[in-house]
Amino acid sequence: MTTIQKIYSRSIYDSRGNPTVEVELTTELGTFRSMVPSGASTGEWEAKELRDNDKNKWGGKGVTIAVHNVNNIIGPALVKSDIKITDQRGIDEFMIKLDGTNDKSKLGANSIVGVSMAVARAAAAFLKIPLYEYIGKLAGSKTTECIPVPSFNVLNGGRHAGGDLAFQEFMIMPIKAPTFSEGLRWGSEVYHTLKALAKKKYGASAGNVGDEGGIAPDLTTAEEALDLVNEAIKEAGYDGKVKIGFDVAASELYNGKLYDLDFKSEHPKPENKLDYKKLYEKYSALIEKYPIVFIEDPFSEEDWGAFSYMSSKTKVEVIADDLTVTNVKRLSKAIELKCANALLVKINQIGSLSETIDAANMAKKAGWGLMVSHRSGETDDSFIAHLAVGLEAGQMKSGAPCRSERLAKYNELLRIEDNLGDSAIYAGTRAADYIKSNTL
């Protein structure tokens, strides 16, 4: 049984050019690496990412303290502990106890999750199985042959782009593709059609891309964005086959009482400040007009009643992200209050693989769907592709089919599908079992 010989961390750069944590873990089988992502629109209750806050370097975004914590605290303690590399939960719990806080703010979630991911890779190598199969065994998954439907963020707004567009992400899902590889092709074709349409309608700059690879034309309303995306789907030849979802990231719009659809505008209109019932009416109108199958974070992370209200009425998938932050305590409350019917899964939100699995299993037991997610500040680490397959998640989002850090995850799913051969199952419409059939 192999043990950890050495753990080393360094500061590298993410897709936004900001520092992030890289971890290398060595056993007698070799060295196994992980790279930690970082979010821009983050939930208040996420595990704490440790930054240096030294304004003289990297604008305060350095991670030298987090790197130091891996090299001088976590690493030596794990090597000394002699915990077996295959004891994922034992290692994760050891690090959580070593941190000693409720939110990992002492050592940093970005330190702990980097080690947790590297441990998983080393354990899979020791067991001579793919990483997704290892995660599946930890999770008790029935199968690790299901490839998720990709959710491509093709048009950016909110905090991910300039302009006045309030909603953060407009996504397309090739639900009716026969395979993942075909779904990726469909998504790529719609994306390029969309980019050409945007440049034709709004000028060359409309083809510029945001943090996650989606285009960022200077739009004002959700209707403008959805019209453009829907037109691209039709022009690419996938009307009725490719569906739409969007992430409102509504905590960014909320002022404690009302939701301000003009929160980015220099000329806000009073009529665009809505209470949750009026905002739900807006969502309902959009659902009736466009082929929408899911809405993520439709309300603020503390507006529990609004989530429950919408979930009791809507016919689409309601995905909880900032509300639940991959945290079993928050998720348990959301399940009890019937706030949503799907969980967005982000491993760095909670800070360890074991806790991520716990949240995913709790959601599945409640009949919720799963969508595994990247972050806006990414690396070329493809871990979440394996996480999605291992957890039997029907859906995964990793940005547009553009920018190498986004394609790293989709390309890894292509490899997994190829390796599985005839046993590979594309989630397809089954990814939306939680969506009423009349939306498909």
Curated annotation (Swiss-Prot):
One of its GO terms (molecular function) is magnesium ion binding. Pathway: Carbohydrate degradation; glycolysis; pyruvate from D-glyceraldehyde 3-phosphate: step 4/5. Pfam families: Enolase_C, Enolase_N. This is Enolase 1-2. It is found in: Cytoplasm. It catalyses: (2R)-2-phosphoglycerate = phosphoenolpyruvate + H2O. It comes from Schizosaccharomyces pombe (strain 972 / ATCC 24843) (Fission yeast). Belongs to the enolase family. The active site is at E212, K346. One of its GO terms (cellular component) is phosphopyruvate hydratase complex. GO terms for biological process: canonical glycolysis; glycolytic process.
